[in-house]
A protein has these predicted regions:
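Structural detector for helix-capping/boundary residues
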Residues: 15, 37, 51-52, 64, ...
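Active-site-adjacent beta-strand/loop module that shapes the phosphate/pyrophosphate-binding cleft
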Residues: 61, 70-96, 108, 112-113
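Conserved N-terminal beta-strand and adjoining loop/helix that marks the start
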Residues: 1-18, 86
Length: 128
């Protein structure tokens, strides 16, 4: 069994958390998530979340802490164990969200209470 490591970030602006929606037709298309992605070889998870956040949202962030970790077996039945870490983030400079249309088609800012109604993966919900 192989291991896959993921890193995501929770950014709060004006009391609301940034969520992005996966593009229809992609894996989990239409689902909302926190920005982030796969840890590349030689990269630390905290570096991954900063890189992925910039790629997916156009925002420059820094890590301020860890919100949680979760591991699970691959949902598609591949012999793989997934390990996800969610980090707390702040913006280096406030900016406008610019999505990568290849991956995401919408974004929104929700309070923790508003986000409770979203269909979120457990590792995202636990990190709110």
């Amino acid at each position: 069994m192989t291991d896959k490591y993921l890193a995501y970030g929770r950014l709060i602006r004006d009391g609301k958390i940034l969520f992005i929606r996966r593009r229809p037709g992609s894996f989990l298309g239409g689902h909302w998530e926190l920005p982030g992605g796969t840890v590349e070889p030689g990269e630390e998870p905290a570096e991954t979340v900063v890189r992925e956040f910039a790629e997916e949202t156009g925002l420059t962030v820094r890590v301020t802490g860890e919100r949680g970790n979760r591991s699970w077996d691959d949902v598609e039945g591949r012999p793989m164990r997934i390990h996800a870490t969610v980090y707390a983030l702040t913006e280096k400079e406030p900016g406008e969200v610019v999505l990568d249309p290849e991956e995401h088609d919408a974004f929104t800012w929700y309070t923790k209470e508003e986000a409770a109604g979203l269909a979120l993966a457990d590792h995202f919900r636990e990190a709110l």
